[in-house]
Amino acid sequence: MRIVFMGTPEFAVPSLEALLKSDDQVVGIVTQPDRPKGRGQQLAPSPIKVLAQREHIPILQPVKMKAPEFLEPLAAWKPDLIAVTAFGRILHSGILKLPPMGCVNVHGSLLPKYRGAAPVQWAVINGDSETGITTMMMDEGMDTGAMLLQERIPILPEDTAGTLAPRLAVLGGRLLVETIRQLKAGILTPIAQNESQATMAPLLKKEDGVIDWSLAATALSNRVRGLSPWPGAYSFLLGERWTIWKAGAIPTQEHTAPGTIVQVTKQSLHVTTGNGLLEVTEIQPANSKRLTVAQYLSGHRIIPGQRFEAGPPVEAAQP
C-alpha cells in the first residue's frame, strides 16, 4: 500500500518509524515549514523532516494547504491512504477525498474526550488516572471523525506531560500500523463518536502557566505536572518570576492568604492555596537553571510569610 505520512513534532516520529518498519510503502512526507528556533532564531527543520531526509523520502512543506504547488505533487504520489500524527493543520475536503482508503489520524486521547491540540497536557492538568491513543477516520472537523481503534494506558502519579507524551507516541505508532493492517483486511468498522461526551483540549498559551493560588493544592500539583515542560507553572516571588517544576499537595486547614509561604524545610517550601498546602520541591528562579529547593536554600534565604504573586509588582507612575 502507498502511504503518505503527515506529521511535524517529536510526538509524530514513532508513528513514522513504525510505518517505515511495516509492509507498506511510505511514498512521501508532508510536514510544516521550517520554523525559527532557539536564541538565534535560526530556521530549523521539524523532527519529521529530519527523519524523512535521513530515510531519503520525498518531502512537501506547504505554506498554504490549498495551493496547487502542494496539491499537485501530493496527488502525484498516488497515496492509497494518508496517515496523520500531530501534523498541526486542518485537512480540507480536497485532501481528505484524495486517497481511496481515506485519511487516518493518531490522536493522543481517549476520544471523544480531549479533542484539540493539547490532549496530553489537559489529561494531566485535570488529574486523570488514565489516557490513551485513538485512531480515527478524518473528516473536516476538529478530531470529530469516526473512531477505529483505541488503547488505554495509566497516567502515573509522577507523570508530567513531558514524560507521558513519549509513551503515548510509541503506542500511537503501534496502533497506527495495526489500524492500517485491519483496514486492509476489511475487519475494522468505524464507530461514530458520542458528541454528548466530547470535551476540548485547546492549545496552551504562555499565560496559561500563571499559577492561581486560590485553586486547591491538588489542582495546582496537577497543573505543575501538566504544564511541564511548556509553558511551565510560574508565579512571582520578591518581584522575580519563579517556575515551579515539582510540587505535591498536603491536606491542611491553613487559612493564611493563598500564595503565602508558611513553612520552609530543608527540602521544600509549603505554600498556602485555596485548599491545602502546596509542597514545592523543584524550582527555577528567573535567570537560573532548574534547582531543587534544597540546592536553592544552600545559597539563599526564604522566610515564612513571603508570598507568591500572580505577576510582578507594578511600579507607581512618577508624578
Predicted features, each with a name:
Residues P9-F11, V63-K66, F87-R89:
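Short beta->alpha connector loops
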Residues Q25, H56-P58, G102:
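Conserved beta-strand segments of alpha/beta enzyme cores
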Residues V13, E17-K21, L71-A75, V177:
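Amphipathic, non-transmembrane alpha-helical secondary structure
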Residues Q32, P36-D80:
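N-terminal glycine-/serine-/threonine-rich beta1-alpha1-beta2 phosphate-ribose binding loop
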Residues S22, Q32, L81-M200, K205-E207:
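Donor/substrate-binding cores of folate-linked one-carbon enzymes
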Residues M1-R39:
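N-terminal Rossmann-like dinucleotide-binding module
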Residues S214-P319:
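An anion-binding loop in the catalytic cleft
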Residues G7, I29, A52, I82, ...:
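A residue-level signal for conserved active-site and pocket-lining positions in enzyme catalytic cores
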